[in-house]
């Protein structure tokens, strides 16, 4: 891995951490209702895995989905809008922390049930193969 690639990955991890730290502050201000499942300490997982995916690949994850969402290209403002219940959020402000969603980026969300993404991911993979699509 080149130095430039290492710096790029570190920058992505730092971006995720920055977002999560902002989430903590906004949550402490009482602007985020419900649960807030943070990704602090797991930044390398999303940065490392998603950086290896192609544009046709799909991502589905569990309830700690902020890092994955940012790595697939969702904007910080869109993600924060979802957390604060605004209509400009990725799930129109109704999904909150566990239910980010961006079909235009092949991001099929986080899921509030532990392990719930496994059968959904299996079905997604089957559909991609069955329909002859890339991914």
Predicted features, each with a name:
Residues 1-7:
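Charged, compositionally biased N-terminal leader segments and the immediate start
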């Amino acid at each position: 891995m080149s130095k430039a690639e290492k710096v790029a990955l570190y920058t992505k991890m730092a971006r995720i951490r920055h977002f999560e730290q902002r989430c903590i502050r906004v949550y402490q201000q009482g602007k985020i209702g419900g649960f807030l499942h943070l990704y602090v300490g797991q930044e390398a997982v999303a940065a490392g895995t998603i950086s290896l995916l192609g544009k046709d690949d799909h991502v589905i994850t569990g309830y700690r989905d902020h890092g994955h969402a940012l790595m697939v290209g969702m904007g910080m403002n869109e993600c924060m809008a979802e957390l604060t219940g605004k209509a400009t959020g990725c799930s129109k402000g109704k999904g909150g922390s566990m239910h980010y969603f961006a079909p235009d980026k092949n991001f099929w969300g986080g899921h509030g049930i532990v392990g719930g993404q496994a059968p959904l991911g299996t079905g997604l993979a089957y559909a991609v193969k069955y329909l002859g699509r890339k991914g």
